[in-house]
Regions:
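Catalytic cores of secreted/periplasmic lytic hydrolases that degrade extracellular macromolecules
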Residues: 29-211
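Sec-dependent signal peptide recognition
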Residues: 11-18
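N-terminal secretory signal peptides that target proteins for export/translocation
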Residues: 1-9
Length: 211
């Protein structure tokens, strides 16, 4: 008698579990997944960049693996620090550096020991470009030149001026975004689009590593 009662209880429990399982399969709604937040980097020259030094360095190394990680990490941090001082978008500045130097491969008029990362003054063999003492000062000059393009004459620098061409362009607000650099910073008709393409690659890279 006890054995039969035990079997009946087990059958009852099994039946209840089966009902619950079937209910969940046919009635429970699927919990919606939270959509992945897209990475949209600004193309504006003024403002704060979104990417960290680690993210910038990791992106850079995928395009030039011959540069030491420790160096490019410090170098990327220079861009973030210097850009922050002058309200310049560090993502834009870093992308422009990648374009101008071929991801620090150089190969044109400007040589690596010039510490010139944006082609300042590079015109011909007699004028190969401005030279700066250190990597950080070269980055600072780049940031200052972007600030000169993106602000009016009344906006002053926070760091000491080292860009020798700053006052040539710091009169009126010439540009607001990377596309305005076409025909102003460089004569290349696709200059702004080339920077945009690098920033787009940054967005894809960051999205992929977050998966």
């Amino acid at each position: 008698m006890k054995c039969k009662r035990r079997i009946d209880i087990e059958k009852f429990i099994f039946f209840i579990n089966l009902v619950l399982l079937l209910y969940c399969l046919f009635s429970c709604k699927t919990v919606p997944t939270i959509p992945e937040k897209e990475i949209n980097l600004s193309r504006e020259i003024l403002g704060k960049g979104q990417l960290s030094a680690v993210q910038l360095a990791d992106f850079f190394i995928t395009n030039n693996e011959h540069v030491e990680k420790e160096f490019i990490l410090k170098f990327a941090d220079y861009y973030i620090q210097e850009a922050s001082m002058e309200n310049i978008n560090s993502d834009v500045a870093f992308a422009q550096m990648c374009l101008e130097t071929g991801f620090l491969r150089f190969g044109g008029l400007v040589q690596p020991d010039f510490h010139n990362y944006c082609g300042l003054g590079a015109m011909d063999a007699e004028h190969p470009g401005e030279k700066f003492e250190t990597e950080q000062l070269g980055v600072r000059a780049h940031i200052q030149h972007l600030q000169a393009y993106a602000t009016t004459q009344d906006v002053q620098l926070n760091n000491q001026l080292i860009d020798p061409r700053y006052n040539w362009v710091h009169k009126t607000k010439l540009v607001t975004d990377i596309f305005g650099l076409t025909g102003t910073w460089a004569t290349d008709p696709n200059y702004g689009n080339k920077i945009d393409e690098i920033i787009s690659r940054m967005e894809v890279f960051i999205k992929n590593i977050k998966k």
